């Protein structure tokens, strides 16, 4: 294989698909409240599979390799009263544990059974009203298990209190979920090791608040990392559309990373939600880089 350095045409503008993490959370909320208009939805396969599953009337839902869809749909279908589904996936998906989430949902009163190996998909889920509103779950597991519970919390009669045990991993993803819930009008609090999602009641007209309000999904920062690398290597300016200066995504940390270690400055143009990646032409690159990527593993 022969690799040659290419000449990048500078100052081009590129539009990246919406954030998968934000899109998947909004799809669940849209299905729960029926009146969220989502723009710039992610075109990722995971998001497409989740959207297809939410709109399906089939008794068997196959989400293939989409791990986020498996986790979010497990909680979603557990509160769909009177509906029974089998939630399955690829052979690889059947090797990925979902026990922590199922245990938490069962503790709330959900009716979920394993159809093959204990602790793993496929699942048989019979939707019902969940009577309990407090659950304890390990904090050092995938944040998607916890976010999955948070997304349905406001639909429970008394809301949901989640007690986290241990050190939290991927904290930015939990904060993202909480911020999205607040944006749609669902009150929540995170104090110490306890997350509280307030219920929807007669004084909290979330559906009315959301009516005809469009959500423009900011573009995906982890995907932007490739273009930051192009700017860093070529030392040419690259422009990216639909990125907000105050991002919900933990992966937006790449702005500081590429400035500190590669001399690529990020300039925001708020009116157009556009950012320009401007490389410093006389930058002294460090001999080595040491970074803690715990809060932004996708980059």
Predicted feature descriptions by range:
Residues 1-299:
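Short, structured segments at the rim of ligand-binding sites
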């Amino acid at each position: 294989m022969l690799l040659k350095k290419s000449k990048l045409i500078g100052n081009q503008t590129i539009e990246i698909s919406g954030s998968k993490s934000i899109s998947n959370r909004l799809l669940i909320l849209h299905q729960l409240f029926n009146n969220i208009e989502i723009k710039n939805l992610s075109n990722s396969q995971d998001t497409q599979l989740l959207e297809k599953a939410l709109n399906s009337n089939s008794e068997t839902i196959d989400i293939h390799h989409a791990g986020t869809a498996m986790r979010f749909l497990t909680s979603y279908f557990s509160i769909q009263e009177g509906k029974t589904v089998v939630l399955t996936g690829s052979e690889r998906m059947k090797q990925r544990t979902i026990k922590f989430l199922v245990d938490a949902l069962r503790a709330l009163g959900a009716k979920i059974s394993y159809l093959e190996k204990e602790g793993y998909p496929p699942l048989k889920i019979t939707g019902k009203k969940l009577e309990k509103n407090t659950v304890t779950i390990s904090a050092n597991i995938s944040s998607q298990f916890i976010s999955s519970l948070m997304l349905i919390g406001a639909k429970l009669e008394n809301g949901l209190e989640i007690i986290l045990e241990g050190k939290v991993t991927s904290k930015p993803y939990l904060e993202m979920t909480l911020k999205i819930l607040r944006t749609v009008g669902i009150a929540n609090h995170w104090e110490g090791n306890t997350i509280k999602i307030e219920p929807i009641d007669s004084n909290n007209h979330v559906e009315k608040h959301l009516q005809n309000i469009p959500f423009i999904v900011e573009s995906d920062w982890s995907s932007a990392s490739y273009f930051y690398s192009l700017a860093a290597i070529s030392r040419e300016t690259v422009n990216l559309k639909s990125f907000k200066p105050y991002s919900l995504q933990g992966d937006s940390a790449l702005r500081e990373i590429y400035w500190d270690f590669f001399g690529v400055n990020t300039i925001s143009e708020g009116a157009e939600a556009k950012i320009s990646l401007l490389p410093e032409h006389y930058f002294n690159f460090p001999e080595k880089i040491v970074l803690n990527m715990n809060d932004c593993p996708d980059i």
